[in-house]
C-alpha cells in the first residue's frame, strides 16, 4: 500500500513537471530523430497509398489517432497491414484458442476450474458477463435476410452510413475491411462446458458462412478506471466485460439491420465468435499486431479496447490497414514483457514464423493460467495498462510523444523512456477509484 502511494505521488508530480517543462526537451529530441533505413524504405515494401480523402462519417469525419503518424497500406496477399504473410495461413478451430484449451484441461485442473470462476467471482464483472448471455444465441447473432433486397447507395456512401450507425450507437471507433479467409475459425465452440468431458468434435460446429466484408466495432475500456486499477484487481475483468457487452450489443443490432435490408450479416462477439478478432481489427484499419502476439494495438487506445464484428456480403468500401510504426516500437519497448505478472510475453527482438505469418511468440499458456487463477482480482490487463500507446491524458505533450513514437526505432526508445520517467502505466491513482473490491471472493474455490 505504501509503495502504491509513493508511485501515485511520484506519478502526479511527474505529470505536473511534464506539463510545465517538457516542451523544449520534447521538441529538441523530435528535431534530432532520424528514422532507420528500413523504416524509410517501408513505403516501397508495403505499397503505401494515401487515404481516399472522402468523408468517412458525418458523425466522426476523421479517426482520432492521438497524434500518431499513420500511413495507410494497400490490401494484398503478402501482408495484413504490417504483418508479413509468409505462406498460406492455416485456419484454426476456436477449440484451440487459449481459454478453450484451459477448459479442455490441457493446462491442468486449476485453469480448467478457474475458467468458470475468474470473471464471475467479481460480483460486478460477473453481472455484466451474465448479461452477455442475452445476446449470445444463434438466432440473435445470425438469421435469414429479408427475401427482397432494399435499394442501397453506392458502397462508399453505404460505408459512411454504417459507420454513422455504429457511432450513433456509441461505438468509440469503427472500421470496415476486406475479410481474409483465415480470419474465420474452421469450427465454432457450441458447447463450452462439454469440452471438459466430451471429445472436441462433439462440442464444435463447422463455420460455413464466409462473407467478404467485416465491420469492426471498438469500445474504450475507460481511461480513468484504468488509471486507478493495478491491472489485475477486481475491476480488471469488469472493464473487459463492459466493453465486450457494449460492442456485442452494437454488433447484433447492426447485423439485424443489414439483414433487414436483404443482405447476409452475422455478428461476432465474446460470447459467440466465428471470426478471429485481431485479424478483423487489422483488416479494418484499426490496429497493428503487437508484441503480445495475439492482440492488436490502436494508435490512440493501445490495448484499452474490446471489439465485436459483423461479417457481411453488403457491398462496402473497405478502409485501409494501418502502419503507425508499431513493429519498430514493440521491437525496442518491451514494457509489457517487463511488467507481465506471469512472464508470459516474449522478450525476443524480432517476430518469428507462426502458422504462415510473423508474430512474437508469447507464452499463451502462462497468460491463460494467470488470468484464470489470479487470486488478487479478476483476470488481468497489465499489458493494457502499461503500454505507452495508451494515450494516458488528452494533452499536447502525450500526443507529441505518440507522434514521436511512430517515427521509428530510435524515436520509440525515446517515447518508452519518457513513459517510464513520468510514471505512465505503473502508477495507481486512488482518486479515480470508484468501485468496491471483494478480496474474499477472489480466492479460488
Curated annotation (Swiss-Prot):
Q: Which UniProt keywords apply?
A: 4Fe-4S, Cell membrane, Hydrolase, Iron, Iron-sulfur, Membrane, Metal-binding, Repeat, Signal
What enzyme category does the UniProt record give? hydrolase
Subcellular localization, as worded in the UniProt entry: Cell membrane
Which positions are tagged coiled coil?
none
Which cofactor names does the annotation list? [4Fe-4S] cluster; corrinoid
Protein name (Swiss-Prot/TrEMBL): 3-chloro-4-hydroxyphenylacetate reductive dehalogenase
Q: Does the keyword Iron-sulfur apply?
A: yes
Signal peptide limits: 1-42
Instruction: Report the membrane topology from the UniProt record.
Output: Peripheral membrane protein
Q: What is its EC number?
A: 3.8.1.-
Q: How is the cofactor bound?
A: Binds 1 [4Fe-4S] cluster. Corrinoid.
| One Pfam family here | Fer4_7
Task: Relate the protein's function as given in its record.
Answer: Catalyzes the reductive dechlorination of C1-OHPA to 4-hydroxyphenylacetate with reduced methyl viologen as the electron donor.
Gene Ontology molecular function terms on file: 4 iron, 4 sulfur cluster binding; hydrolase activity; metal ion binding
Stored SUPFAM superfamilies: 4Fe-4S ferredoxins
Ligand binding ([4Fe-4S] cluster) = 330, 333, 336, 340
Q: How does it assemble?
A: Monomer.
Record note on modification: Predicted to be exported by the Tat system. The position of the signal peptide cleavage has been experimentally proven.
Q: Which GO terms describe its cellular component?
A: plasma membrane
Domain 4Fe-4S ferredoxin-type: from-to ranges? 320-350, 368-397
Amino acid at each position: 500500500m505504501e509503495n502504491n502511494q509513493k508511485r501515485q505521488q511520484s506519478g502526479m508530480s511527474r505529470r505536473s513537471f511534464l506539463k510545465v517543462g517538457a516542451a523544449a526537451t520534447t521538441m529538441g529530441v523530435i528535431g534530432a530523430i532520424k528514422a532507420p533505413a528500413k523504416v524509410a524504405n517501408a513505403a516501397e515494401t508495403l505499397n503505401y497509398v494515401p487515404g481516399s480523402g472522402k468523408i468517412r462519417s458525418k458523425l466522426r469525419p476523421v479517426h482520432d489517432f492521438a497524434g500518431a503518424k499513420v500511413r495507410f497500406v494497400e490490401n494484398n496477399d503478402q501482408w495484413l497491414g504490417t504483418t508479413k504473410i509468409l505462406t498460406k495461413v492455416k485456419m484454426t478451430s476456436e477449440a484451440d484458442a487459449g481459454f478453450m484449451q484451459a477448459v479442455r484441461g490441457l493446462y491442468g485442473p486449476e485453469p480448467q476450474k478457474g475458467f468458470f470462476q475468474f470473471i464471475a467471482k467479481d460480483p460486478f464483472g460477473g453481472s455484466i458477463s451474465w448479461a452477455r448471455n442475452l445476446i449470445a444465441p444463434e438466432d440473435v447473432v445470425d438469421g435469414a435476410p429479408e427475401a427482397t433486397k432494399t435499394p442501397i447507395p453506392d458502397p462508399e456512401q453505404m460505408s459512411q452510413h454504417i459507420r454513422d450507425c455504429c457511432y450513433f450507437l456509441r461505438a468509440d471507433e469503427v472500421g470496415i475491411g476486406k475479410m481474409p479467409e483465415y480470419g474465420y475459425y474452421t469450427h465454432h465452440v457450441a458447447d463450452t462446458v462439454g469440452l471438459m468431458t466430451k471429445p472436441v468434435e462433439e462440442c464444435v460446429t463447422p463455420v460455413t458462412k464466409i462473407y467478404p466484408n467485416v465491420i469492426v466495432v471498438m469500445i474504450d475500456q475507460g481511461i480513468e478506471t484504468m488509471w486507478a486499477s493495478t491491472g489485475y484487481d477486481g475491476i480488471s475483468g469488469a472493464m473487459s466485460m463492459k466493453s465486450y457487452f457494449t460492442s456485442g450489443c452494437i454488433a447484433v443490432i447492426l447485423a439485424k439491420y443489414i439483414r433487414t435490408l436483404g443482405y447476409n450479416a452475422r455478428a461476432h462477439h465474446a460470447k459467440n465468435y466465428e471470426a478471429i478478432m485481431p485479424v478483423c481489427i487489422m483488416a479494418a484499419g484499426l490496429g497493428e499486431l503487437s508484441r503480445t502476439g495475439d492482440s492488436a494495438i490502436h494508435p490512440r487506445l493501445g490495448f484499452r479496447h474490446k471489439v465485436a464484428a459483423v461479417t457481411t456480403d453488403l457491398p462496402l468500401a473497405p478502409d485501409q490497414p494501418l502502419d503507425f510504426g508499431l513493429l519498430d516500437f514493440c521491437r525496442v519497448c518491451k514494457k509489457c514483457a517487463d511488467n507481465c505478472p506471469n512472464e508470459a510475453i516474449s522478450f525476443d527482438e524480432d517476430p518469428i514464423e507462426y502458422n504462415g505469418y510473423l508474430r512474437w511468440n508469447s507464452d499463451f499458456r502462462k497468460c491463460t493460467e494467470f488470468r484464470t487463477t489470479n487470486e488478487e482480482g479478476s483476470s488481468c490487463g497489465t499489458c493494457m495498462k502499461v503500454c505507452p500507446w495508451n494515450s494516458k491524458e488528452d494533452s499536447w505533450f502525450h500526443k507529441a510523444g505518440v507522434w514521436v513514437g511512430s517515427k521509428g526505432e530510435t524515436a520509440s526508445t525515446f517515447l518508452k523512456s519518457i513513459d517510464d520517467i513520468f510514471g505512465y502505466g505503473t502508477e495507481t491513482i486512488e482518486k479515480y477509484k470508484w468501485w468496491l473490491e471483494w478480496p474474499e471472493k477472489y480466492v479460488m474455490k
